[in-house]
């Protein structure tokens, strides 16, 4: 169940970040409200996750996968560019998250 909470937290963080981009500095009402609601849900489920999983693994997974998926969305939806160094760096983040989850401290 705790990995479901983490997944919901990551998904709503990505949604919130996408709304943040479209809010244009909090000048657009609906994207601003979407940002606030999404991040509220995100941090609620993140707080539930850290009740069950170690903070270091939870945060690394949340931040790492959030960054990777947000980058993918920024390329697909917002037509932003990434270079080779960015792609390699994102690959290293994915490797780090996997290693932490496989070999990191667990309860």
From Swiss-Prot:
InterPro entries: Small_drug/metabolite_transptr, Small_multidrug_res
Gene expressing this chain: qacG
Function of the molecule: Multidrug exporter. Is implicated for the resistance to bacteriocidal quaternary ammonium compounds.
Membrane-spanning parts: 1-21, 26-46, 57-77, 84-104
Keywords: Cell membrane, Membrane, Plasmid, Transmembrane, Transmembrane helix, Transport
Membrane topology per record: Multi-pass membrane protein
Annotated family: Belongs to the drug/metabolite transporter (DMT) superfamily. Small multidrug resistance (SMR) (TC 2.A.7.1) family.
UniProt name for this protein: Quaternary ammonium compound-resistance protein QacG
GO molecular function: amino-acid betaine transmembrane transporter activity; antiporter activity; choline transmembrane transporter activity
Predominant location category: membrane
One Pfam family here: Multi_Drug_Res
């Amino acid at each position: 169940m705790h990995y479901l909470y983490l997944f919901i937290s990551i998904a709503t963080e990505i949604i919130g970040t996408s709304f943040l981009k479209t809010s244009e500095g909090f000048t657009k009402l609906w994207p601003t409200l979407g940002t606030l609601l999404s991040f509220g849900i995100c941090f609620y489920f993140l707080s539930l996750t850290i009740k069950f999983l170690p903070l270091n693994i939870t945060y690394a997974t949340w931040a790492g996968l959030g960054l990777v998926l947000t980058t993918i969305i920024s390329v697909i939806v917002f037509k932003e560019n990434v270079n080779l160094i960015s792609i390699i760096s994102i690959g290293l983040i994915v490797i780090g998250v996997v290693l932490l989850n496989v070999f990191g401290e667990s309860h």
